[in-house]
Amino acid sequence: MKQKEIPYKIYLEESEMPKEWYNVRADMKNKPAPLLNPQTLQPMTAEELGAVFCDELVAQELNETDPYIAIPEEIRSFYKMYRPSPLVRAYCLEEKLDTPAKIYYKFEGNNTSGSHKLNSAIAQAYYAKKQGLKGVTTETGAGQWGTALSMACSYFDLDCKVYMVKVSYEQKPFRREVMRTYGASVTPSPSETTEIGRQILKEFPGTTGSLGCAISEAVETATTTEGYRYVLGSVLNQVLLHQSVIGLESKIAMDKYGIKPDMIIGCAGGGSNLGGLIAPFLGGKLRGEADYEFIAVEPASCPSLTRGRYVYDFCDTGKVCPLAKMYTLGSGFIPSANHAGGLRYHGMNPALSQMYEDGLLEARSVEQTSVFEAAEQFARVEGILPAPESSHAIRAAIDEALKCKETGEEKTILFGLTGTGYFDMVAYEKFHNGEMSDYIPTEEDLAKGFAGIPKIS
């Protein structure tokens, strides 16, 4: 066995938890392009955004100057239920791979929601309650975000309406029941309950849905129901801000032991986990203090960074949300029903998209059978059953560690283990039975999505 000079798990003291979120946009030389009003094509004002989002969250969304924003005491108190989360040295995985690489992962699955999503859910619910709202609406893919928000709303006694992507609603019935346990109403999307849902069902009969569809329904419900606002689990900059606690804790823990990661790897859907994990490290790179390699890993079935276009596009299928300049496959792109429901989004966070355009991070896509091979390999040696989404980062981390085995390099790798996969056993079953397929969209498939992108100069 290797000499364990560094603990298997590094836990911070409660007193070491971040008291502020880090806003990476403050350090970006090239700021992300502004959100546009879909009717006027002019930058969205705070007043316009306030019709959809909570007021304080609008202020955070538009804030590109303050590097640090204080975390309210009520949110920090809630964080203490499950944070600080552990930074784990993957000694057993290293030994299994026989690699000179040093592998670390930040484990965010140690709460009932099973993922990192609670970090932003509690913040958004807090600001909704503070504003005096009756409730909130949202979308969810695999269900972690919906679960996290239902927990947060229950804590603050808010009503919670969740539109769950239909394929995940059917694949993960128990995830649905957890949400209902916390008082949320859960509707499969697209549905007959909204005008946009009915339109999508008419245009795409038999569709299994997408995050873009679910967002449209949630926004419609929020904007047509008195006392409600829409909240979301990824994509927008306010969510990346809240998720910066992941990277901040990681950096504090690594600094305590004099560890500097060479590369930082995160799965990428809308960008919340990836952006939160890399934020403080990326800030250091932007300020010229240190250099790191950042790798975004996305599903080959929904390759927004690796095969998408960097343009203004709608954030939702129904085209009611603001336009964002991002890497996108087109808001009309309906990804195949793969088993990483939380990554089935057509676009990418605007700040991360700008960073990718500027060459600050690398992106790669992986097929789901290879992802589940990595998930199983990890589970057998590290004792955690990883979520399919998280397993995209595991795949890349293993690949990089094996490269180190070939070259003899002793690179230090940090990846984000966003959550657990206990509600994903249908996916694991299909993998074990040899029934899992790898779908990669053709150029013709992508062209259909690109055709719906608005022409904005």
Which functions belong to the PLM regions below?
Residues 3-133:
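Positively charged, low-complexity intrinsically disordered leader regions
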Residues 68-70, 194, 200-238, 246, ...:
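Active-site/ligand-binding loops adjacent to catalytic centers
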Residues 86, 105, 117, 124, ...:
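Buried hydrophobic positions in well-ordered alpha/beta secondary-structure cores of metabolic enzymes
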Residues 107-118, 136-145, 236-239, 265-270, ...:
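Active-site nucleophile and cofactor-binding loops and adjacent substrate-binding regions
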Residues 120, 128-167, 260-274, 294-295, ...:
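A short, small-residue-rich loop immediately preceding and capping a beta-strand
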Residues 123-133, 147-159, 180-181, 278-288, ...:
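Alpha-helix C-terminal capping segments
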Residues 137, 145-208, 304-314, 425-433:
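Active-site-proximal loop->helix
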Residues 268-276, 368-434:
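Claisen-condensing/thiolase-fold acyl-transfer catalytic domains that form or cleave C-C bonds
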